[in-house]
Amino acid sequence: MAGSLFADASKRLEKALKYVAISDDAGERLKYPKTSLSVSIPVRMDDGSLKIFPGYRVRYDDTRGPGKGGVRYHPNVTMDEVQSLAFWMTFKCALLNLPFGGAKGGITLNPKELSRAELERLSRGYIEAIADFIGPDIDILAPDVYTNEMMMGWMMDQYSIIRRKISPAVVTGKPVTMGGSQGRNTATGTGAFYIMQGMLPKFDQYPENTTVAVQGFGNAGMVVAECLYQDGYKVVAISDSQGGIYNEQGIDIPAVIDYKQRHRTLAGMYCDQAICDLGENQQISNAELLALDVDVLIPAALENQITRDNADQVRARYIFEVANGPTTTAADDILASKGIYVFPDILVNAGGVTVSYFEWVQNRSGLYWSAKEVNDRLKEKMVEEAEHVWNITQELDVNVRTAAYIHALNRLSEAMDAKGTRDYYQDS
């Protein structure tokens, strides 16, 4: 637990352990990952030079089933980050009652600096390096930050080449033509929207009286913003890594999505070269967005966005974490003292892994579902588990994050106990 992010993540476990009758053995196991792999990936660049990229894969726990977790491409990827993300995946899968453990992977690079051919060589090289540690019954990959269905297709193809058989279930989030599931591309954002639909009315927050700010306008942030807009919520602010826009009257989300998809950034959306016509819109920074006086704040970017340093500036009444780990433990305490409800990442963004599970099931069975079937099953799953978590908050008088960890811990503890005491009887 040397890394700062992982040390912070583990504090959430410690808070929940006070409320769960878990054995000392089970508690001790959950403090450490099962396997942590570091690899070096050589890639021949388009100019003929050779570059080495560091890569990682962590399988945190497989008590409830094979590891499950995405692969991210980002300049800030470290073993500490990957281990923390695998830790969160363990609890996320248990919380949603999926037959998976938690895993995560990543490569340290800026993918925007590589050509498509270089990214393909990198993706295939990553699978070459970790092939003996993954598989449909061992550890299953998926998209994450700056990875997409195209890259998942390359990875599945490379694994199939290595194993000399078609193995679609080793990767989820693939193109539909390669065995991917309907609805997987939008699952994280759609699942978050279902959680909000179920939870906000408990506080008398409805579309007509609720303002929303979304930090992060990648796949998940874009989808949840559009879902909210279509349902009648007033989305007044959005941002990406380059900055954002604010409009007190509400933003035309479909128009922004169209621009973002054509230009890959929100920066300059209302500008022609150096001349900007913002109209009713104002340009704002990510820091300013987090401090807006809105009903709902949705962090949908990266981890550690709300910290001890800026939590006191947050004025939203409800936070729904679409990103992984956007709020630090110290910030949690400050937000709680202000009466702000934080709906945690392991619940809110679990739509992605839930539909990944659906894809894995479809790959294994050979039976494929329509988009309506996928979304109906997703909504049922998300709403059901959110209600379980909410009931725990009422019964034990704990915050929503602690309730989510309690719910997940109960399932993990049951699975560990069900496996028996084989460790006591192994030959020394």
From Swiss-Prot:
<dbReference type="InterPro" id="IPR046346">
    <property type="entry name" value="Aminoacid_DH-like_N_sf"/>
</dbReference>
<dbReference type="InterPro" id="IPR033922">
    <property type="entry name" value="NAD_bind_Glu_DH"/>
</dbReference>
<keyword id="KW-0521">NADP</keyword>
<keyword id="KW-0560">Oxidoreductase</keyword>
<feature type="active site" description="Proton donor">
    <location>
        <position position="104"/>
    </location>
</feature>
<comment type="subunit">
    <text>Homohexamer.</text>
</comment>
<dbReference type="GO" id="GO:0005829">
    <property type="term" value="C:cytosol"/>
</dbReference>
<feature type="binding site">
    <location>
        <position position="356"/>
    </location>
    <ligand>
        <name>substrate</name>
    </ligand>
</feature>
<comment type="similarity">
    <text>Belongs to the Glu/Leu/Phe/Val dehydrogenases family.</text>
</comment>
<feature type="binding site">
    <location>
        <position position="188"/>
    </location>
    <ligand>
        <name>NADP(+)</name>
    </ligand>
</feature>
<feature type="binding site">
    <location>
        <position position="68"/>
    </location>
    <ligand>
        <name>substrate</name>
    </ligand>
</feature>
<dbReference type="InterPro" id="IPR006095">
    <property type="entry name" value="Glu/Leu/Phe/Val/Trp_DH"/>
</dbReference>
<feature type="binding site">
    <location>
        <position position="219"/>
    </location>
    <ligand>
        <name>NADP(+)</name>
    </ligand>
</feature>
<dbReference type="InterPro" id="IPR006097">
    <property type="entry name" value="Glu/Leu/Phe/Val/Trp_DH_dimer"/>
</dbReference>
<dbReference type="GO" id="GO:0004354">
    <property type="term" value="F:glutamate dehydrogenase (NADP+) activity"/>
</dbReference>
<dbReference type="Pfam" id="PF00208">
    <property type="entry name" value="ELFV_dehydrog"/>
</dbReference>
<dbReference type="Pfam" id="PF02812">
    <property type="entry name" value="ELFV_dehydrog_N"/>
</dbReference>
<dbReference type="GO" id="GO:0006537">
    <property type="term" value="P:glutamate biosynthetic process"/>
</dbReference>
<feature type="binding site">
    <location>
        <position position="92"/>
    </location>
    <ligand>
        <name>substrate</name>
    </ligand>
</feature>
<dbReference type="InterPro" id="IPR033524">
    <property type="entry name" value="Glu/Leu/Phe/Val_DH_AS"/>
</dbReference>
<protein>
    <recommendedName>
        <fullName>NADP-specific glutamate dehydrogenase</fullName>
        <ecNumber>1.4.1.4</ecNumber>
    </recommendedName>
</protein>
<dbReference type="InterPro" id="IPR006096">
    <property type="entry name" value="Glu/Leu/Phe/Val/Trp_DH_C"/>
</dbReference>
<dbReference type="InterPro" id="IPR036291">
    <property type="entry name" value="NAD(P)-bd_dom_sf"/>
</dbReference>
<dbReference type="InterPro" id="IPR014362">
    <property type="entry name" value="Glu_DH"/>
</dbReference>
<feature type="site" description="Important for catalysis">
    <location>
        <position position="144"/>
    </location>
</feature>
<dbReference type="GO" id="GO:0005737">
    <property type="term" value="C:cytoplasm"/>
</dbReference>
<comment type="function">
    <text>Catalyzes the reversible oxidative deamination of glutamate to alpha-ketoglutarate and ammonia.</text>
</comment>
